[in-house]
UniProtKB/Swiss-Prot annotation:
Renumbered ranges of WD repeats: 178-217, 225-266, 279-319, 328-367, 374-413, 419-464, 467-506
Residues carrying Phosphothreonine: T577
Family: Belongs to the WD repeat GAD-1 family.
Name of this protein: WD repeat-containing protein 70
Modified residues (N6-acetyllysine): K450
Organism: Bos taurus (Bovine)
SUPFAM superfamilies: WD40 repeat-like
Sequence ranges of Low complexity compositional bias: 92-102
Length: 652
């Protein structure tokens, strides 16, 4: 940068005498400075190069520190020791001092350059200038003590990132009472505004976090599947529909307010090939929405099929997947799920196998592991990680296993000693994919159910939460809210959260006070206390109970005395005795009993003498041919038997 000398400036830019006379002063003070654009551009280029070099050095130092931490983690336990952290901190401080010294040297070299801008005040020029401050653009760095504090904060943040247990939001909890029976289904919409619960009591209840207060009451309760247990509830990826899977053979889809949108059709159970039916023919187990395609979902059933459906076409399924054993026989799928991108369909079967299909190829599975869990047990849950490469399975053999679908020939890890007694016990991944969560079951009065956390990288049991004195059936870790929902075997649903780590959800309703119940306005009859009131307004004095009962006994209305029979003609809607009117007398006489109890032989012989004296019918016909009446002779049975032939006689 060029500065004009005093001699040059006096000739070129001296005061104009005419202007001085007009304005009343002799000069304008200091002279304007000139700037060299090329020098300014060169200075800017140097600054950019220096900053990029510092950024690259910082990245290299960070990579070296990460490599050192990985080596220490492999050689030592899970948590880094204090000595290792001190060494790393000392190394980082020494490297920072080296870089600061090199930066000071370079800045001192560049301090010889000329200044840019107007001249500094006199006080600042007289003060000693730190060579570190000349080449710095922007605000000055903080003191050394603050640097040390920031380094400590960074170390704390890195330790928190390394230790995923600190990210578990379990400092606070709320309890939602669904009912008295097992909470077998949980669902939370993608935004985290509404929670839906279902249980063995056939009820589905809706909970709105923004609308609830500290009483935690559901705003709607219904029974969408009548007398069938609710097995699965899941919101669609848009949050406007809920898939309801119950113990029946027909799944239902309802909207956010509980109104039915569609119901799957039931298939023909008399057809052998289940692919030729239009729907399921046996009890359902679970269901799942497609993560990408709106309106598509999947169900599995006891008819040994996994079917995909569309909301727009409830009269027939979209496709059918038929799990098979290695011998080609039918096998019942107990749970199913989509991968995170929706390209794969995974199902766990009763023979202990896990089968994975390509969604567009329904014939043969893409992956098939036949002994994933013990045969004859119900695998209750399979779920994919958020990165889509790892599959977790919760078996009925009290195990939790982790699988890599890129090498689906053996499990990566396996954890045992996790009892389960429900066919819908859940397992899920944390939002950062570093933890796996599942629940345990207990007998009544034999302990408390737990929520167990495993680290995905080492599969070590790193944390446990005692939920309640009942089994833990369902668990759900919402990625947006960072809150954990748990369904238990005693009808409770619990929500775990941390005010500092969680968002919205349970935090919205905890701060609201419970509304006071409105007192019902009851109208009571006022007593007339004045003793000299009119008789029609006067009320009787309160008597003793015994006297009041005796008086009520004499009252036919209060004692419910039966009505006496009506004498004479009927009245008051009651029929009187017979014969009171002409019509009743006629009816009574018509309906008389006229049965003849006389002897018929005597009645005939009564007319025998008259018939003999005055024959009219039979006797005149025989008067000439047979004037004397002849009767047949009575023969004994012995004579009849004698006249019979020998072959007709009875043998004794």
């Amino acid at each position: 940068m060029e500065r004009p000398g005093p001699s040059d400036g006096s000739d070129a830019s001296g005061p104009d005498p005419q202007l001085a006379v007009t304005m009343g002063f002799t000069g304008f003070g200091k002279k304007a400075r000139t700037f060299d654009l090329e020098a300014m551009f060169e200075q800017t280029r140097r600054t950019a190069v220096e900053r990029s070099r510092k950024t690259l050095e910082a990245r290299e130092r960070e990579e070296e520190m990460n490599r050192e931490k990985e080596l220490r983690r492999q050689n030592e336990d899970l948590e880094p020791t204090s000595s290792g952290s001190n060494v790393a901190r000392a190394c980082s401080k020494s490297s920072s001092r080296d870089t600061s010294s090199s930066e000071s040297d370079e800045s001192s070299d560049s301090s010889d350059d000329e200044l840019i801008g107007p001249p500094l005040p006199l006080k600042m020029v007289e003060e000693p200038v730190n060579p570190m401050e000349e080449g710095v653009l922007g605000p000055l760095p903080p003191p050394l003590a603050e640097d040390v504090e920031e380094e400590d904060d960074d170390d704390g943040d890195s330790e928190e990132e390394e230790n995923p247990v600190r990210k578990i939001p379990d400092s606070h909890e709320i309890t939602i009472k669904h009912g008295t029976k097992t909470v077998s289904a949980l669902g939370l919409d993608p935004s985290g505004a509404r929670l839906v619960t279902g249980g063995y009591d056939y009820d589905v209840k809706f909970w709105d976090f923004a609308g609830m207060d500290a009483s935690f009451k559901a705003f709607r309760s219904l029974q969408p599947c009548e007398c069938h247990q609710i097995k699965s509830l899941q919101y669609s990826n848009t949050g406007d529909m809920i898939l309801v899977v119950s113990g029946s053979s027909q799944a239902k889809v309802i909207d956010r307010d509980g109104f039915e949108v569609m119901e799957c059709i039931k298939g023909d159970q008399y057809i052998v090939d289940m692919a030729n039916t239009k729907g399921h023919t046996a009890m359902l187990h679970t269901g799942s929405w497609h993560p990408k395609i709106k309106g598509e979902f999947m169900t599995c059933s006891n008819d040994a099929t996994v079917r995909t459906w569309e909301v727009e076409n409830p009269k027939k399924q979209k496709s059918v997947f038929k799990p098979r054993t290695m011998q080609g026989k039918k096998v019942i799928p107990t749970t199913c799920t989509y991968s995170r991108d929706g390209s794969l369909i995974a199902a766990a079967c009763q023979n202990g196998s896990i089968q994975i299909w390509d969604r567009n190829l329904t014939v043969h599975p893409k992956f098939h592991y036949k002994q994933a869990h013990d045969p004859g047990t119900d695998t209750s849950c399979v779920t994919f990680s958020y990165d889509g490469t790892v599959l977790a399975s919760r078996g009925g053999d009290d195990t939790l296993k982790l699988w890599d679908i890129r090498q689906f020939n053996k499990p990566l890890f396996s954890a045992s000693g996790l009892p389960t007694m429900f066919p819908m016990t859940d397992c899920c991944f944390s939002p950062d994919d570093k933890l796996i969560v599942t629940g345990t079951s207990v007998q009544r009065g034999c302990g408390s159910g737990k929520l167990v956390f495993f680290e995905r990288r080492t599969f070590q049991r790193v944390y446990e939460i005692d939920i309640t004195d009942a089994s833990v059936v369902r668990c759900l870790w919402h990625p947006k809210l960072n809150q954990i929902m748990v369904g238990t075997g005693n009808g409770l649903a619990k929500v775990y959260y941390d005010p500092n780590k969680s968002q919205r959800g349970a935090k919205l309703c905890v701060v609201k006070t419970q509304r006071k119940a409105k007192q019902a306005e009851t109208l009571t009859q006022d007593y007339i206390i004045t003793p000299h009131a009119l008789p029609m307004f006067r009320e009787p004095r309160q008597r003793s109970t015994r006297k009041q009962l005796e008086k009520d006994r004499l009252d036919p209305l209060k004692s419910h005395k039966p009505e006496p029979p009506v004498a004479g003609p009927g009245r008051g809607g009651r029929v009187g005795t017979h014969g009171g009117t002409l019509s009743s007398y006629i009816v009574k006489n018509i309906a008389l009993d006229k049965t003849d109890d006389s002897n018929p032989r005597e009645a005939i012989l009564r007319h025998a003498k008259a018939a003999e004296d005055n024959p009219y019918w039979v006797s005149p016909a025989y008067s000439k041919t047979q004037p004397k009446t002849m009767f047949a002779q009575v023969e004994s049975d012995d004579e009849e038997t004698k006249n019979e032939p020998e072959w007709k006689k009875r043998k004794i």
